[in-house]
């Protein structure tokens, strides 16, 4: 089963009021080999909801989003991109992955509802936050120093993964999350249960 790693940049934290302003995704096969990437800015139709505190995180201004496609166009383009790389398999054949991925899914589902589109994805989730929590507990109990935080940066630092650029965007976070998930899954080849 293929793995779709998502990350969204948002105009704020309240689904239904705040909006998706950038969608980034990385598509991996079941062995966590990167197959393709996707990124698009999204024009914020509710300009009142654009939060300055969120802008400090994603560093996208309203002016930069002025020429971005609207949400409906981005969702259509996103699904077309996925279908192309899935060789026309159903989008329900994907694991949806991310760092605290439920937060992104809540916003993405709200976007699908707003656009009166049916949710095309499965309910199969892989959450880096949860996997890292469990893995780090096991490693700590075996004497390996683990991060004190479960932030994406802390998990990435543990695996010696670094951001490529200085800018924070949804695609870079999706790629770093995917690489962290690959590293977590690599431990399944190392960790053994005692009989």
What does each of the following model-derived ranges do?
Residues 89-90, 119, 190-191:
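Short, structured loop/turn "capping" segments at alpha-beta junctions
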Residues 126-145:
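Short alpha-helix plus adjacent loop in nuclease-associated cores
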Residues 10, 18-20, 32, 118-120, ...:
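Catalytic phosphate/metal-binding cores of nucleic-acid and nucleotide-processing enzymes, i.e., regions
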């Amino acid at each position: 089963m293929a793995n779709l790693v998502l990350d969204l940049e948002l105009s704020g934290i309240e689904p239904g009021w705040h909006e998706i302003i950038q969608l980034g995704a990385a598509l991996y096969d079941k062995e966590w080999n990167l197959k393709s990437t996707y990124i698009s800015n999204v024009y914020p139709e509710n300009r009142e909801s654009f939060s300055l505190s969120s802008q400090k995180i994603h560093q996208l201004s309203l002016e930069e989003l002025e020429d971005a496609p609207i949400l409906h166009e981005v969702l259509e383009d996103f699904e077309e991109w996925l279908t192309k790389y899935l060789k026309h398999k159903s989008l329900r054949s994907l694991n949806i992955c991310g760092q605290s991925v439920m937060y992104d899914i809540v916003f993405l589902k709200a976007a699908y509802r707003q656009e009166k589109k049916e949710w095309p994805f499965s309910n199969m989730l892989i959450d880096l936050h949860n996997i890292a929590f469990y893995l780090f507990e096991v490693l700590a109990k075996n004497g390996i120093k683990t991060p004190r935080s479960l932030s994406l940066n802390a998990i990435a630092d543990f695996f010696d993964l670094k951001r490529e650029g200085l800018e924070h965007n949804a695609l870079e976070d999706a790629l770093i999350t995917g690489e962290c998930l690959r590293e977590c899954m690599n431990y399944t080849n190392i960790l053994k249960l005692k009989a």
